[in-house]
């Protein structure tokens, strides 16, 4: 069993930067954070990272952030990676991000996707997302961060993880769906858990099974889980 964070990486501002922000997760404050993934990692003690982005995403800053935490940062590696990303075209297939995966830690993976501006790119992205099913294992706990990058990625994550759970039948659990409210006027930005949206999908599925087939197993399982949470 592993705690896995699935998160997306955007391109930042025109200077390829995310501004440092203070985040609050369940009452705990994390200061001067560039990537919400860093705060989530500290708060939930994440074991592995599965990061998703395009060839233009801020991979060099991901490398800098996580390699500095491990005292393995190398200036030449950072500069070479940044140059490769800047020089790559928007339609570049993939770039070598092995140094970023190494900085993230053992078992972490990076998935490079397209911009999704046409059906071919959307299908390509879906195939990339489906690779998650090959490495997720029974018992894994999934934390989803939808703060950065394309909003469409959130839909991909919901659909694919729901498919992995219910069709491929991997015994994974969605522990949290997290969104850092950068638009908040508060100095410390709240991180909200949108897990209720994922729960609604499960309840809709259970209601459909009961309505059309008289099958109450899914609803009974969901009720049991809610009772269990209430007694924690």
Regions found by a protein language model. Give the residues of each.
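Long, low-complexity, Lys/Arg-enriched
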Residues: 1-141, 162-229
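Elongated alpha-helical scaffolds
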Residues: 142-159
């Amino acid at each position: 069993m592993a705690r896995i964070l699935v998160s997306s990486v955007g391109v930042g501002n025109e200077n390829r930067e995310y501004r440092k922000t203070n985040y609050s997760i369940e009452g705990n404050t994390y200061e001067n954070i560039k990537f919400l993934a860093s705060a989530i990692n500290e708060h939930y003690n994440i074991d592995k990272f599965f990061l998703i982005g395009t060839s233009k995403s801020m991979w060099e800053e991901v490398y800098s952030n996580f390699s500095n935490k491990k005292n393995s940062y190398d200036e030449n590696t950072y500069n070479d990676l940044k140059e490769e990303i800047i020089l790559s075209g928007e339609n570049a297939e993939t770039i070598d991000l092995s140094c970023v995966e190494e900085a993230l830690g053992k078992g972490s993976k990076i998935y490079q996707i397209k911009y999704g501006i046409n059906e071919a790119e959307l299908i390509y992205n879906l195939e990339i997302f489906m690779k998650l099913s090959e490495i997720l294992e029974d018992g894994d706990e999934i934390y989803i961060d939808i703060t950065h990058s394309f909003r469409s990625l959130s839909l991909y994550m919901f659909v694919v993880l729901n498919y992995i759970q219910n069709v491929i039948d991997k015994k994974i659990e969605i522990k949290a769906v997290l969104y850092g409210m950068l638009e908040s006027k508060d100095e410390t930005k709240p991180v909200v858990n949108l897990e209720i949206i994922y729960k609604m999908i499960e309840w809709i599925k259970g209601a459909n099974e009961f309505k059309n087939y008289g099958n109450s197993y899914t609803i009974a399982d969901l009720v049991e889980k809610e009772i269990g949470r209430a007694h924690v």
